Amino acid sequence: MHPMALHMVLPAHLPFLSPEVLRLLEVHVKKWMHFQRWGLPRRVEESLRQLMPNPPLYYQPGNDQPVSFNLNNTSQVSLHRSETISLQTWCSCVAGQPIQTFWVSEWSTMNPEQRHHCQQTPNPMALALPSPALKALSGPHPQSGGQDNDSGSDLQQKYSQLFCGLPSLHSESLVATFMGSQGLPKIENVPKPPLKDPFLFNDLSFPQLLPKTSPQSAPPSSPLSPNWVSPSDHQRAQINVPFLTLAEYEALEWHLLQRQLQLQWGWPAALQRSQHTQCLMQHEPCGKAQSPETTTASQTGKSISVLTRELLFFPEHARKLLEFHIQKQSIRHRWGLPQKIQQSIQLLLTSTDQQTVSSSSTALANVSIPQPVALEANGACDVLSPIAAPVSIPRPHLLTQVKAILQSHIDSKCGQIHQGKIPACVHRSWDCRISGVLAVAPFPCIPESQFLVLQTASDPDLHHKVMPWMPTALDQQQQALPGTVTEHPKLLRVLSVEAIEKLETTLRHKHLAFLSGLPALYYVALPRALAPAVTSQSVITEMEPSPVEIPAEPLI
């Protein structure tokens, strides 16, 4: 087993941890033990070699000179006392173990004697804590009720968690919890470790682990290892890996928080773009990490909140509709109504009656419609608060009145048609078509009693009257057909009797098809099917001279 492996000692009962937290801690400890035994993956090691050409240093157990991890028998590298070292360096120095190479690929170069000596680990606590912290925990503490031995052993078990890969904030909370539960003074005024480098190994500075006890209360005890050399205070405060700067660490942390919130809550794309533009425009250096919960706009002062848990019940299509609605509203607030809509509104205003406009001119009001305005140079990017320019458009109630007037006109015309009243203008159009050359296009939806209407078409009073009509029964029409056909004086000059009969039959069938709701194709198919039967008797009459030739196709 690798000599730097840390053994996790958990007490039998942890009342302040839930089962879920315990499972997460177990998984984390397993990963940490695997890392301590097998090291980093080979690709990660290669990338670290590029970032760290000079690996971290160990201290020799016998002297006070720093040496490299990749220690050979003939070469040693001396650096200043202020060089930062990792947690594994402390663990090896406390246990008094020989030097071990840092890279996984160089573990095979270790001597058999060193490997045999590395397997003899004296105490797991010596790997996890330095000698001063170990003395402070193992020594007697001022307790009430004579619980010195029990509290000391309990603290030894609990403090073994602190350097097993727990997050730094969780380790700090454990420190405060353990010291408060055991009657030790809490750490309050101890300065926090500098955030210049990330906690890659999740370690704490050793002065935070030492309880605030007076030197007289804790009697001196001999160190566990006689070869251990106490490092300086500056080296104690910098037990970090020095290949990430503060800006890179904060940028990575902010990106990670953003991705986690995006995956958990599912922000709409519009909010993501607005927050991204606000971050770019308001914070040009981007040196400060913002809070992931709210992003404050620079001009309006309104905060754009992150979607909360109450919106998780939204289905996917509802989220898409909401995003589309937000995009439309943002475009409308920024650029105003489209140009075609504005032109149609102006045409509507100019096409209305002058009297209506004059009577309703007092009801018009100026409604502020935002127009495209150039952004200022200070980086304002709030798309929901543009500078508005006044444009004169009517209020919605005027459009409602126009719609109501048009609807009432359509309803009145439909009512007249259902009642059988034909306007006089329709009669005039029929008269003009019939009096000219033979109309080649039939009249759609004309009742079967049209021939009665045509008889009175020459009456000039019909131009100023409304002509009611009611369709006659089919049996009455069949009785009237064998008899004499009423002739119109104008129709006699242009139509023969057979043409009039054919026209009446076509109109009758079309009217019946219209009443029965048949499609338009039936209007064409039925007259074509009945055309030979209707015109069979008129073949002989075609030989005689007639003023107008009867067309072969029915009048459609």
Swiss-Prot record:
> Which InterPro entries does this chain map to?
SPATA31
Looking up Pfam families in the UniProt record yields: FAM75
Q: Which domain of life is it from?
A: Eukaryota
Q: Where is this region: Disordered?
A: 133-154, 210-231
The Swiss-Prot or TrEMBL record describes its family as follows:
Belongs to the SPATA31 family.
What is the source species? Homo sapiens (Human)
The organism's lineage is: Eukaryota, Metazoa, Chordata, Craniata, Vertebrata
- Which protein are we looking at? Putative protein SPATA31F2P
Record field: compositional bias (Polar residues) = 144-154
